[in-house]
């Protein structure tokens, strides 16, 4: 932003321009600061100095100017007046000059500026050029030209001549080559730059003739130099340019045309090729300087085209001279001045009336001096703020913009007639005059002119929230008043938000000020109340107060003030309102006051100010202390007491969170409003005391009674409490733990779980309601809890059971909200608890409200121990360990994820509990002792190992991003032998996880319960679930986590499933033990090994100590998927599953990881043990089916017949086995096929083919690939770069190939491009759209439809995949023509132009299609556009015509669709189009249902783009299947194909034995270098053949998604960027990025669980806006 005070930083432009010898006295008097101040038509004239060489040099310069002017006279008719320049006074001297000619100096030695002496012939020539270019002849009397100089720039003059020569060579007319002059008024600091470097584009803001960024604007007339008329006395500098107009194009005035065509069409503002100048067609109509828009309409617009772009400086514009002028206007000002304005400030008339000079100093701009100024006032004796000696102003604002922020009335001088501050709209204002201290300079004048001309205001921020504005006097004149005379002063306007002075005012005149101050300063008034009270009280005993203890006396009375405010019995002090009538009284007291002590007080006040200060912190302490006195109650006498129960200390203290305090205070107010019954209170106290003595004595009661305040400081708490407060702000409550059962209510809703070790759990509870909760629990545990006593407690506290429950509920909600604020939390949806430990056999107890009907005790035990809790008999207790058959959905198992210490560790460590809510109901069947005893004696077959009794995990880490899985993997004390799925997830952070993972789905399991109980349970669970889900969503919104709500309600199927909630599950579990399961597993594996040995083959043993890199050369097996003991329960296997397809699936998922642990634990005793790769229920007879049923490829691998195979497998560590699995996945990714597209045989294609085949890759025709491809197959299509334009559209099935992400395209020039990965990637991502005339037909398309389409396109386009609409210029031109008469067409055109600026719409240049005789776009045009935009993957042709007639378009790789179909069925039409954010678009194959594909598969196939054609080592291509994905595939087919659940279950059971069989066929080791591939094809039934192929394809896709660790670097893995050759290792960061893909898979599976019926789902899915799918 240009400012009048910024420009002093500019350096002097030129020695001859800034200083010198000659000149008149006026110019010599100019201050040096003027040269650095910004001028634009104002400011003191040019400081042009004459050279000191004497008259000879001067006359020589004049002679040169005359010679140059003699052949540079204007030839244009508009400059005809310049041809006859007056020479009369100089005629007698010419003969003399001819006889004394001085030799011309070389042009190289000339300075940039050649000064001209006023009165010389050269000076007159320049003036005549100006006079001849006036619009009005009367302007001659208004302009006074004081200084002039010629500009000599050899470079610019040479380019000017070259431009003229070029135009002449092009055959231009002499009229076009004629030279004339144009003018530009510039600021002083710009003169040097323009004359040195020429006039560059961008110097103007006018747009009437063309874009100012592409050309330059110059004035045609020398007296029309700016848009506004010049003011009298204005000074400025004019640069005269020598110009060649060239070929001129006349431009219509866009404001004069009714249609907005020119404004909407950006190309209308562009320069015209083959032209050099634009002029307005209305320029000849301008006949007066005061005509409307005269300045804009009389401009020249010059530009110049280079070879392919516009030049930044047109060469046919050359600076010729610079002239300094002064403007004087003959118009007389009105003599009549209204009498009402006679009191307004006028510097010239009233300059002597200013009595006060309030400040003198320097006005600076960015540290540089502008001028010396002073501030004066006639009525005000003080400034509102102390100003420094140097006032540095750096900010400038537009006066119009400022008046939008501040009321315009503040800028009228008549507002400030009085002596006082003016209060307007809450602002206190005062006005002063700023005058220049000396009369020798003109910087103030030039500054005034600059501010007037550009309507600017100087702004200086001040302290105390104030501002200083320096304004021109013209800006202080009301719009209806005329400024009578030129002023030489500025106005200084001070604005503050608070009053700056104390004034004695007349009666009633100050009512407004205090009132407004009262509204704007409430906090100050609050402080003033107790200060006034304190000072009034101090004044009563002022003689007795020494200066030393004055502040302590004030503190005493401030404390008393607060006591009165909180109802201590004394009357509350009320400050009387301010009475303005007392301002007029000189003496407020009738008698004189005693002031004998004033000297001592003043001395102390000056030299010891700290005595008279009251710190805010001290004030807060006083406030808190006195407020607590009111909150004290009889019950709170004991809330600071410390009690011991079973070695556990329980303390009540301060909550760490402010919100908690607010909730507490609200509850306290409600309770204190009731009267306490003293008898009941005593009864409660006696109960507490009795319980305290019976538990642990009363040793520290007296000590704790000294700490009866509600909110203790942190340092008063014990050490372990301080640790708790430091580690977590969630430590708001401390729950009491005993060996006796604690009641649990609210169906386990309370999230605040705590674990203890020894006696270390202390936390504060800050109100009597928690005291009530603890008391109720204590009474219940002591068997003293009956209905009457509970009611007594409730009534004594004024609280109902519902209130207590609601309070606990609010506390839980708050904890959920505050949980994600902690960085300690691994997931945003997990509640975390600090300082909770275990030791020995202490149980984890879930504590919630004591009013619940049912309760649960959870027992724990160390590994290898038989410790158990001895619970008291209570038929309402039920052990969570017995909920084995309680079927949960995979997203919400009963899972707490405890991390345990090792048995030998006695250290206290912080642990985490990641929890989920589960519905629990109690039964009345048996006592807990019986249950626990049975579990201690014999472990239930369905139970996990002792280490995992409390852990219910999903199978095979079905959802690896689940917070529970991550928590287990991070455990350092207890490690799960995780599966290959979970190994890749150990770096996942909370940002990678969306909360779709925490949806609760509670599926109750078996046996009947009365309908009323079932409905109650269901309602309760749904209520708790909805509350939990809502809070989680609020947390996500606070954290700005992008989350699409896919919440599904818990599934309650039949009454049959509700039965099991009321039965002890141990009676329903299988009798098979863990050891029996392991023995059976060994027998099965031995049978498999013996059958495999019959095939023959060799498999050398490998030492378990071999590194992963060595074992990598011996790939065995698929990755291991453990099987739980429930897999052998044939009863459950064969029962119908159609009623609840999730039930058994989830049951399996609960046991999978535990089975893996069991297998690992039992390895030392069973040397031949192997983990089974089936996650599904496998009947015994199905497991013994012959292996020959599975179809094999002809190149089956021989399996080792040696018995060493079993030993080798048994010796493998799980980590080694997992590494082998990852290696297999790496090998699987290297199965890449290629196709070389060539029209004619070439040597290059033959070399590339031989090279790729040598690497082990196979050639595959695209049609064969589409017919037979599997999900893991990848295809690379290679074409020579020179063939792209002519033949790439002839690739077979190009449209279908583009839809698949596993297909990539490469353009090569040589074999080295393949070897060195320097090929050109083709069809990478995104796409573009081409339409015909029907899409933009105003009769067919509405504005709303077009807007929807463009919005869809905008949402579709991303940085990774850009989409664009390419419109033929023929259609745009037609819209322009229609827009002149048709408003709808104009709206369409306007909308199109808006998106053109966003680069979403591109107007194609004119080409063959745009001919009137041809229909655009033609097929050849689309093919050419496809080749030109080779990086964009898709080309879509939109039309509203019959699509069936355009089948030939599809054969050439072009998608044809209507606009509506494009938006509704985008994913079906286009498929893959974005390499980064491809989340919801399906995979499209030749034999697949396009609408039924899962977004999960597409996410998986992102990694399949990492395609490799060289197989590194000589490893066979083994396609690995994962059984887990049969579940996902099952859910997909349920949602997309519309099959019923029973059929899906049957397919699942059919796939299980095939997976078992695949175990036999995938154990491979090759001694030879043969490359073979084992393709698993299921032939289990005729109808399931193709279906199960899809299933295995899904498995393979999901497998390929997982990344390999760095130890497999000897495998060659190629991406689009690294196509062939060099192997590389995947970094951990890449692995972590790919882990994010699990997220969408997790969410997608949950989506299907809650989706509507398959047909309607598919329909609604296809119609969803793409913006929601991305």
UniProtKB/Swiss-Prot annotation:
Keyword Acetylation: yes
Disulfide feature: none
Residue numbers bearing the N-acetylalanine modification: 2
Phosphoserine modifications at: 344, 633, 636, 673, 800, 843, 927, 971, 979, 1103, 1552
Listed Basic and acidic residues bias regions: 927-938, 1532-1545
Residues found modified as Phosphothreonine: 982, 1049
GO molecular function, one term: RNA binding
Superkingdom field: Eukaryota
Residues that span the membrane, as ranges: none
Cross-link (Glycyl lysine isopeptide (Lys-Gly) (interchain with G-Cter in SUMO2)): 586, 823, 832, 872
Annotated GO biological process: anterior/posterior axis specification, embryo; constitutive heterochromatin formation; mesodermal to mesenchymal transition involved in gastrulation; negative regulation of gene expression, epigenetic; protein localization to heterochromatin; transposable element silencing by heterochromatin formation
Subcellular localization: Nucleus; Chromosome
This protein's GO CC annotations: heterochromatin; nucleoplasm
Location (main, coarse): nucleus
Regions of compositional bias (Polar residues) in chain numbering: 67-78, 1546-1558, 1659-1670
Record family assignment: Belongs to the TASOR family.
Record function comment: Component of the HUSH complex, a multiprotein complex that mediates epigenetic repression. The HUSH complex is recruited to genomic loci rich in H3K9me3 and is required to maintain transcriptional silencing by promoting recruitment of SETDB1, a histone methyltransferase that mediates further deposition of H3K9me3, as well as MORC2. Also represses L1 retrotransposons in collaboration with MORC2 and, probably, SETDB1, the silencing is dependent of repressive epigenetic modifications, such as H3K9me3 mark.
Name listed for the protein in its UniProt record: Protein TASOR
Biological source species: Homo sapiens (Human)
Gene: TASOR
